[in-house]
């Protein structure tokens, strides 16, 4: 699908983009190893992915500036203290909630952390007025963040920000990419080495996790990238998931940083407020969901007997940032008891908040309850003796272990 009204702008900037990308690649190839740890040389980066900031009101904007961004800043400072590897921030779209006048202020707030800030455009980042063509609807975003489709290199990965929201004059939208974007992607792929990892960053998901398939509009992207390792980084869904379709094709759906649309401090799938951290070390990726205000090693949330509705006789644990490569085991009084039982359930903390603490108009309360759904990143165990000592150990796909004791 061609949008001829944008072709002139696209062509004028093509040469500049290509030059910037080639300079970035040259810098990558010439980069001297950085010293890290006890004399060990490592190369890489830290990318803090922020899902759908989406402030709609001035109060939400202040909360983003005064509560959430300072906690992200603490993560930036921890990375700086660990090494001199570069750190950047990526916003997965819906930078605002139809309040495009907030865009410059949100960008400035994130830039105050002193690291590069990249973004993709979301459906709520358009100036939503009826009978407004897509180019005009995108103008506030483009004036703030630059072109919708950009490329930048970090470590041994090339990142491509893609606009996959096609906006209609009647204020509706659908998900897709146009043929010019695919041409642009093909040009980028001809310029980068075959062994360079590719990360395509878009707002709406590229896969259907429940079917284990790539959405039809994203299939040409997969074909163009070819045999390279490809990661999609997306938002929009307001929940966390990692879809591993093959060893070289993974999607990371990043949960909303503010919880459930600012109305709950937890996303409806049980993911606490937080960011998604991608760390590249010597060409290899590792990642985790980082809860705001918590340490990087805090990944387990535990409910004792009687605290989780529907599982009152069990100890229940939630794995934050779970995917299907996790292993969760337990021991009782020092005796290994094997794998914990995986269960699907609504998040106990989310439901407690909705039923006991949330106080909004009925329309919002109904939305909070309706959005809650059962997820499978929960595990449970039942003691064989009362007051026994329990140890829960969870191991992620990278071999990192996380332990809690009761």
Tell where the protein language model's regions lie, with residue ranges.
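Bacterial N-terminal signal peptides that target proteins for export
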Residues: 8-23
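Bacterial N-terminal signal peptides
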Residues: 24-30
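N-terminal active-site segment of His-dependent metallophosphoesterases
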Residues: 33-104, 386-391
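Active-site glycine-centered loops adjacent to acidic/histidine catalytic or metal-binding residues
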Residues: 52, 93-94, 122-123, 203, ...
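Short acidic, glycine-rich surface-loop motifs adjacent to enzyme active sites
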Residues: 92, 189-209
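Extended active-site neighborhood of metal-dependent phosphoesterases/phosphodiesterases
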Residues: 100-194, 213-233, 237-281, 285
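Binuclear metal-dependent phosphoesterase catalytic core
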Residues: 249-333, 371, 376-405
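Aromatic sugar-binding surface patches on proteins
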Residues: 348-381
């Amino acid at each position: 699908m061609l949008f001829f009204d944008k072709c002139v702008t696209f062509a004028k900037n093509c040469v500049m983009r290509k030059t910037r990308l080639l300079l970035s690649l040259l810098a990558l190839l010439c980069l001297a190893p950085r010293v890290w740890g006890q004399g060990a040389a490592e190369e890489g980066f830290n990318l803090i992915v922020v899902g759908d900031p989406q402030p709609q009101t001035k109060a939400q904007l202040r909360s983003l500036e005064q509560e959430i961004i300072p906690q992200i800043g603490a993560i930036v400072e921890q990375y700086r203290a660990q090494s001199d590897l570069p750190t950047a921030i990526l916003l997965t779209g819906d930078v605002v909630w139809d309040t495009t006048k907030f865009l410059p202020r949100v960008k400035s707030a994130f830039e105050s952390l002193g690291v590069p800030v990249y973004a993709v455009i979301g459906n709520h980042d358009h100036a939503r007025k009826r009978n407004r063509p897509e180019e005009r609807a995108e103008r506030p975003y483009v004036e703030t963040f630059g072109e919708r489709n950009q490329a930048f290199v970090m470590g041994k990965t090339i990142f491509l920000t893609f606009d996959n929201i096609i906006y209609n004059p009647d204020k509706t939208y659908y998900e897709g990419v146009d043929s010019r974007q695919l041409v642009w992607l093909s040009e980028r792929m001809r310029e980068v080495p075959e062994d360079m990892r590719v990360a395509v960053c878009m707002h709406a998901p590229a896969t259907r996790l429940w079917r284990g398939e790539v959405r039809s509009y994203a299939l040409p992207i997969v074909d163009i990238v070819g045999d390279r390792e490809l990661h999609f980084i997306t938002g929009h869904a307001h929940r966390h998931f990692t879809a591993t379709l093959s060893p070289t094709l993974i999607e990371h759906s990043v949960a909303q940083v503010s919880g459930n649309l600012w109305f709950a401090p937890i996303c409806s799938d049980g993911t606490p407020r937080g960011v998604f951290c991608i760390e590249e070390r010597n060409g290899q990726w590792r990642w985790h969901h980082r809860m705001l205000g918590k340490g990087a090693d805090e990944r387990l949330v535990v409910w004792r007997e009687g605290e989780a509705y529907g599982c009152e006789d069990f100890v229940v644990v939630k794995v934050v940032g779970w995917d299907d490569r996790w292993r969760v085991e337990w021991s009782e009084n020092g005796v290994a008891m094997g794998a914990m039982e995986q269960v699907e359930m609504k998040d106990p903390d989310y439901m407690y908040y909705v039923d006991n603490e949330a106080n909004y108009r009925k329309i919002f309360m109904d939305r909070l309850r309706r959005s809650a759904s059962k997820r499978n990143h929960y595990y449970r165990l039942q003691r064989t003796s009362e007051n026994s000592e329990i140890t829960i150990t969870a191991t992620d796909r990278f071999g990192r272990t996380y332990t809690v004791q009761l």
